[in-house]
Amino acid sequence: MPGRTWELCLLLLLGLGLGSQEALPPPCESEIYCHGELLNQVQMAKLYQDDKQFVDMPLSIAPEQVLQTFTELSRDHNHSIPREQLQAFVHEHFQAKGQELQPWTPADWKDSPQFLQKISDAKLRAWAGQLHQLWKKLGKKMKPEVLSHPERFSLIYSEHPFIVPGGRFVEFYYWDSYWVMEGLLLSEMAETVKGMLQNFLDLVKTYGHVPNGGRVYYLQRSQPPLLTLMMDCYLTHTNDTAFLQENIETLALELDFWTKNRTVSVSLEGKNYLLNRYYVPYGGPRPESYSKDVELADTLPEGDREALWAELKAGAESGWDFSSRWLIGGPNPNSLSGIRTSKLVPVDLNAFLCQAEELMSNFYSRLGNDSQATKYRILRSQRLAALNTVLWDEQTGAWFDYDLEKKKKNREFYPSNLTPLWAGCFSDPGVADKALKYLEDNRILTYQYGIPTSLQKTGQQWDFPNAWAPLQDLVIRGLAKAPLRRAQEVAFQLAQNWIRTNFDVYSQKSAMYEKYDVSNGGQPGGGGEYEVQEGFGWTNGVVLMLLDRYGDRLTSGAKLAFLEPHCLAATLLPSLLLSLLPW
């Protein structure tokens, strides 16, 4: 496969210290959707407010004909087609965005899933019912032409229908789908989940990994590896061991991708530890953000531009596109031009892989393959040791991203610093108590509208003041699973705050959003490269999960007080006194 050959060559060059000066391969081979003069002229003309719109538009005719016509037109205008004629060319040769998809109502959707009956508050129960209805609005299936003429689409064909995030995101996304599936399973839509899982497994069989999303321009980057965790959620609800048996080797293949292509060695205390990072050695601007990437690169020397574009893609692969996480420690921590994603070993990525390795061991044991079960048990043990040595900080009581260049931890606050608690990847039985102190020390419990993504105000969307649903889940579920009563109560109060934020905004705007602003009364968030999006797949999924877990206690009323230690003690006191009474 040409892309794989390019990557192997690039890894060799990087090993020889030739990285930033070498031309990197493009995101995909398409000279329309991924690289080339046509893409450059259209995107730099800014025909559309959002660069993603153009690269999502299907072709009206074969790509060879489109390119030939464009080449002739460009030559006639000295390779600079006037805007009006460029617009006319696009109008003639491309279809409107979204033409390749059609609405889909899942066959397994039902009116009243059981979990709704667990919600005591009538307003919250009605709201949950409305969110359950949204699965029909977010359902999509591909038209047959995507299969018969794939060269005319940037969309990657998937056999089974799926749920999309919403807004500008009309295709599937990898890590979003984990929380979407959690919500779908509560809605008793296991067949929909199975189809989405099969789509991802098919992609692994074809490409060796799950791409960032369902477009060809996403092919060479992935997202946080949650496929094995998705399979576990599905199995927990269905006990479909036959499906696991059919696909266990494909799950292993995906983990192999991360081992072979995203592994780094960290030397500490006389030992070498293998951990993973986000790393996308492919050049050129991101097609879906082309003009922004070109303009950002124009601020750098020409020899540094390819490296910048590769780091931007790695940031997109992280799911946190973009954040101070990937800027801190570099020469320009206040600008996206200083992004250095691949220079950091992320806590959350390694916690996800740690849990995946534990699940793979359990899966193989379930299937009677003891040798493979042992293999993954050893891998998990090795990763746990690496997490404990390289990322864990005993004094602070949290894990931190490790800077490969500075050879030190990034001690800034991010909810991802507690992902090992969520993933069950720790060995210290007192870790939940330390995590609570860490949250208190950073005054995170004083935020009434959700846990902020960081305490850095950079204008990036994965920073303060935005709060994102999956990060709420990482902290809340991590604390909820702890045996410590205080941790469980904080988890509930955090869940209550997040539910009220989402419910209040929905009551005002009749919409769910991808992110919320904790500094502005929990209103829809902002910042980043595009306007805040409605929908919204994983936000809906997390809300349904919290309503399922705490439905008998959650209320739609006024906000609670800050979760300062003294307030928390007051909250806990009645339940503690009740527990002492003889019954």
UniProtKB/Swiss-Prot annotation:
Top class in the EC scheme: hydrolase
Name of the protein this chain belongs to: Trehalase
Gene that encodes the chain: TREH
Medical condition linked: Trehalase deficiency: An autosomal recessive condition characterized by the inability to digest trehalose, a disaccharide found in mushrooms, products containing baker's yeast, and dried food. Individuals with trehalase deficiency suffer from abdominal pain, increased rectal flatulence, and diarrhea due to osmotic water flow into the colon.
Sugar-bearing residue positions: N78, N239, N261, N369
Function: Intestinal trehalase is probably involved in the hydrolysis of ingested trehalose.
PANTHER family tied to this protein: TREHALASE
Family: Belongs to the glycosyl hydrolase 37 family.
Enzyme Commission number(s): 3.2.1.28
Active-site residue list: D321 (proton donor/acceptor), E514 (proton donor/acceptor)
Signal peptide: 1-23
Domain of life of the native organism: Eukaryota
Residue positions assigned to the propeptide: 557-583
Tissue specificity annotation: Expressed in kidney, liver and small intestine. Also more weakly expressed in pancreas.
Organism the protein comes from: Homo sapiens
UniProt-listed GO biological process terms: animal organ morphogenesis; trehalose catabolic process; trehalose metabolic process
Subcellular location: Cell membrane
